[in-house]
Each structure stands twice: as C-alpha cells, then as structure tokens.
Amino acid sequence: MTKYSAVLFSGGLDSAVLLAEALAAAGGERAAAPLPLYVSAGFAWEDEEQAMAARLFSRPPFAGAVGRLVSLRFDVRDVLPETHWAVRGTPPAFDTPDEDVYLEGRNIILLSKAALYTAAAFPTRSAAARIALLFGTLAGNPFPDATPQFFTTMARTLSLGLARDFVVETPFVMMRKSEVIRRGMELGVPFELTLSCMQPARGRHCGRCSKCRERRDAFREAGMEDPAPYRETPVR
C-alpha cells in the first residue's frame, strides 16, 4: 500500500518531536518524508509560531529533510467574539487548569483543513493509497475532540466525504509531555526553537501563561533544563 503522510505542526515541542519521529521513520528518503502543515485560525500567537518554525526548519534534524512549512487558513474570528482570549492574546494565567485553554472544535478544524489539502496534494484515488494525518495529542488530554473515538470517527468521516482512505495517527497518545521531551532529545530536536506559549513576543515565551507552566513542569519532570528563552522566568 502507498502511504502518504502529513504532520499537524504548531511549532510547539510536541509537534516538533512528532515531525522528527516521522522523518526518522522515513529513513532519510525525501519522497517518504511527511508534509508539515500549519493551520492558522486567526489566533494572537500564530505569527510568532510560524516565524519560529522557519528557524526550526533550518536546523537538524529538519534542515534538508523536510520541505517548507505549508501554511493553511481556517479563520474562526467570525465565530469567536473579539474579546475572546485567543483572539486578543490574553490567555489564562500561570496556575489555571488545562480546561481553561479549551478551544471548541479546534481539532475538527485542524483535521478538516489538513484532509482537504492532502486530498488535493496527493491526488491518487487508488484503493491502495492511504493518507495518514499525524497528530500530537498526549496522554491525559481532557478534551472531547482528543479521544480515540473522536479520531477514529473523524478519519472515517473524512474518508467517506473525500473518497480517500484517511487514518488519523496519534503516536504520543500514551505518553506524557516529559516522555516526549526525552524522545526529542534522542532525536536531536532543538527545543530552544520550539514555542509553547500563548503570549509570545520576538521568539520568547512569556513565562506567565498556563502553557508556559505546562512546559516548565514537563522539563522538570524530564530532569532537563528548558533551553528556550523566557521574558519572565517561571519560578513557581
């Protein structure tokens, strides 16, 4: 069976390790390399993420092994109010629970847009061709659009609606973020060029949002120092 693959890429450490893992699995064959896709929804941090991704792709293990980052648009600012924290760039604070950053329908948007793009980019309709959408969800994700049932059902829906054979793969679904970090170290991922922040500025993490706290805790659990720059050091 011919298998095409695309990685849903955000510029964060999870998707960076996921892409590095997929490149390693491709064995250096450019034709087998996954297609990195970034879906822009109109959120405040997206320009920073894409700028950092360009720097990341200039470094091993990505340089020369993967093509440019494909940037797609699926703007939701006509759905969310102008005062929404993701639009204004005023994210939940450091100690708030993960549930506070939930963006309804986020994974539906990402997978739908990725499927539409890959259906056109990989035009074969052969029954022996499969398109894999690689998604970096982790263990313990509390949201309804991050369950195994959701991903299986979504793949079935995309396959039916686009007359392709889609599968959504979640290789890290049983892993904690600290385990992903350790795997990334083995693969040589330059974590200083990954961005896991909802209020970044000039390539630096804010150190104040809950995503910065999550990243700090994961590096501590992994027994490693986070090499990324911060505007404020998350000390709590």
Residue ranges and their predicted role:
Residues M1-G188:
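ATP-dependent adenylation/nucleotidyltransferase module used to activate substrates
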Residues E186-C206:
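Immediate flanking context of iron-sulfur cluster ligation sites
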Residues M1, V235-R236:
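C-terminal end-of-chain micro-motif
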Residues A201-R204, S210-V235:
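Iron-sulfur (Fe-S) cluster-binding segments and ferredoxin-like electron-carrier domains
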